[in-house]
Amino acid sequence: MKCSLLGIAAIIGALFLISCTANKGNFTLVNKSMEPIARASVAICGQTIELKAIQPDTSGTGSYEVKCEGHYTILVEFQSGRTLQKETGYVTPGMDFQHEIAVTGSDIEITQQPTNSAQ
């Protein structure tokens, strides 16, 4: 009886730890403009991911922990010195996310694709 109670407690503890595991977010920033991106910063959930030297028709990637409800703050600086900034997208705990962030010459667009639920 004592062993079975310990086993049940261990299972409950393991399930609790699994449910508290941080979810992951990944993004691909695609340069769809005609100009090289000198640097880009993507901030979300208190984390900032820096990307550099993204040529036209190429991309860079980043990842973060989904530990808040929030949106991306994206800042792009082109090689010419021109900048674009946008707050967009949405993440929430309990899901993993895979996003494509497309940078054109005049806008930043995002495609949100939750990848699974951690229930």
Where in the sequence are the language-model features?
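Short acidic/proline- and small/hydrophobic-mixed sequence motifs that coincide with surface turns
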Residues: P36-R39
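Bacterial signal peptide processing site
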Residues: T21-N23
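Bacterial N-terminal signal peptides that target proteins for export
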Residues: M1-I8
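Intrinsically disordered, low-complexity Pro/Gly/Ser/Thr-rich segments with frequent PxxP/GP/PP motifs
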Residues: G46-C68
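C-terminal motif of bacterial Sec signal peptides marking the signal peptidase cleavage site
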Residues: F16-S19
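A short, solvent-exposed beta-strand micro-motif common in secreted/extracellular proteins
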Residues: E69-S80
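Asparagine-centered strand-capping/turn motif at beta-strand->loop junctions
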Residues: F27-M34
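Extracellular beta-sheet/turn segments enriched in Thr/Pro/Gly and aliphatic residues
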Residues: Q85-Q119
